C-alpha cells in the first residue's frame, strides 16, 4: 500500500517530515502547479486540513515522548484491560466546574477547561488537536482508569457537527 499511514490507528509526524503519495516534482509536471513538500505533506497540512495525522512532534525525542504517553493509556493487547494508576481524589468535589459552563445556552465556553476539571490531575491527551476543532477527542483518566473523551467544542461552530468533526469522532 503506497499510503498505508492513513490506515494506521495513530500517526505522530515530526515538524521536519513530509507524508504524501506523489511528490512536488510530479505535481509540477502533471499540473504545472508549484507546491513545496511542506505544503503538500507537512504536518500542518495533515493536522489542519486532511486530518491524517494525530499528533505533531517538534522532533524525534518529542515523538517518542508522545508515543510513550499514548501507550500509557492503552492495554498491551486486546485481552488485557487498560493500565490502572493511582487516581486524583480532587475530582470528587470540584465546585469550579459549575462556573465553567454558562447558564445561557447561547454563550460559548472552552470544553477543554471542563475536561481538565473532571479528569485526574487535569491531564488530557488530545488527539488531532488541530483538526475539526468543533469536536475534542482524546484520552484521560478518571479515578485512575483510562477513558476516551468525545466532546463538542462550543467555541467553534457552536459545537455543531460537520463532516470533518463527525469523521474525527467516528475514527476515534
Model-derived features: where do they sit?
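Conserved catalytic cores of soluble enzyme domains
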Residues: 1-79
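Alpha-helix initiation/capping motif
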Residues: 23, 36-42, 90-93, 102, ...
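Short acidic (Asp/Glu) and glycine-rich catalytic loops that position anionic groups and cofactors
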Residues: 23-24, 44-51, 89-97, 148-152
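Terminal amphipathic helices with adjacent charged low-complexity linkers/tails
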Residues: 55-116
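Short low-complexity stretches enriched in small and charged residues
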Residues: 7-13, 101-109, 138-142
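Short hydrophobic/aromatic-rich motifs at helix boundaries and adjacent loops
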Residues: 15-17, 87, 144
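Non-catalytic terminal/interface segments that mediate subunit docking, oligomerization
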Residues: 107-172
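Glycine-centered secondary-structure boundary/capping sites
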Residues: 32-33, 102, 132
Amino acid at each position: 500500500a503506497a499510503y498505508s499511514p492513513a490506515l494506521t490507528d495513530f500517526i505522530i509526524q515530526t515538524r521536519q517530515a513530509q507524508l504524501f503519495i506523489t511528490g512536488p516534482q510530479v505535481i509540477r509536471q502533471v499540473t504545472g502547479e508549484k507546491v513545496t513538500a511542506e505544503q503538500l505533506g507537512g504536518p500542518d497540512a495533515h493536522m489542519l486540513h486532511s486530518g491524517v495525522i494525530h499528533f505533531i512532534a517538534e522532533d524525534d525525542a518529542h515523538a517518542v515522548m508522545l508515543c510513550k504517553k499514548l501507550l500509557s493509556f492503552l492495554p498491551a493487547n486486546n485481552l488485557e484491560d487498560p493500565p490502572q494508576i493511582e487516581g486524583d481524589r480532587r475530582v470528587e468535589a470540584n465546585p469550579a466546574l459549575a462556573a465553567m459552563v454558562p447558564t445561557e445556552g447561547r454563550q460559548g465556553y472552552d470544553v477543554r477547561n471542563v475536561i481538565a476539571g473532571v479528569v485526574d490531575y487535569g491531564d488530557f491527551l488530545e488527539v488531532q488537536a488541530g483538526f475539526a476543532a468543533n469536536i475534542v477527542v482524546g484520552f484521560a483518566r478518571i479515578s485512575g482508569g483510562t477513558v476516551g473523551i468525545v466532546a463538542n467544542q462550543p467555541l467553534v461552530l457552536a459545537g455543531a457537527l460537520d463532516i470533518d468533526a463527525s469523521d474525527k469522532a467516528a475514527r476515534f
